[in-house]
Amino acid sequence: MIIFRRCVFINHRDFQVNEQIRDKEVRLIDQDGKQIGIMSAKEAYKIAQERHLDLVKIVPNANPPVCKLMDFGKYRYELSKREKEAKKKQKIINVKEIRMSPNIEDHDFGVKLKSAIKFLKDGDKVKVTIRFRGREAAHTSLAEDLLKRFAEELREYGNVEKAPSMDGRNMMMVIAPKKQ
């Protein structure tokens, strides 16, 4: 009699497979999803060997634990494919920072505004920071007005996610792109 043993590498989910299942009794489900019944783990493992499949504990917290007959390598491959597919669907949002001083000139303000519009059109968030140096920190109201003006100019491209607030010697505001 030839016994086929599968070399199984456990991935980060820590599934218990084949001989690793130490429970006295398990509820066994076959590869089609039909319940075979409650039996000892050794009997379930023998059935798995006869069918050239793996015995995988899928619900360890149940009483008795639920085990399923399956090709574990194929199952892991399908899981990794699903994870990759989910990663592809995720949208990565970057936060771009624009720094200004409280006494910025109009032309410089326009240049910063154009770059913020470009970032918002690309789908990135924009963090607008005004850095205070020396005595400038006494005039926070000027910086707040400047940030409100900046937000007003960007109204059609994005919404203010975080209102202007002081953070140490900086005043900052976050603008998120509008959803289409």
From Swiss-Prot:
Keywords, in A-Z order: Cytoplasm, Initiation factor, Protein biosynthesis
Single Gene Ontology BP annotation: ribosome disassembly
GO cellular component: cytosol; membrane
Signal peptide feature range: none
Disulfide bridges in this chain: none
Protein's cellular compartments: Cytoplasm
Keyword Ligase: no
Molecular function as annotated in GO: ribosome binding; translation initiation factor activity
Domain of life: Bacteria
Entry keyword Cytoplasm: yes
Function summary: IF-3 binds to the 30S ribosomal subunit and shifts the equilibrium between 70S ribosomes and their 50S and 30S subunits in favor of the free subunits, thus enhancing the availability of 30S subunits on which protein synthesis initiation begins.
Family: Belongs to the IF-3 family.
Assembly notes: Monomer.
Record protein name field: Translation initiation factor IF-3
Species whose genome carries this gene: Caldanaerobacter subterraneus subsp. tengcongensis (strain DSM 15242 / JCM 11007 / NBRC 100824 / MB4) (Thermoanaerobacter tengcongensis)
Record gene name: infC
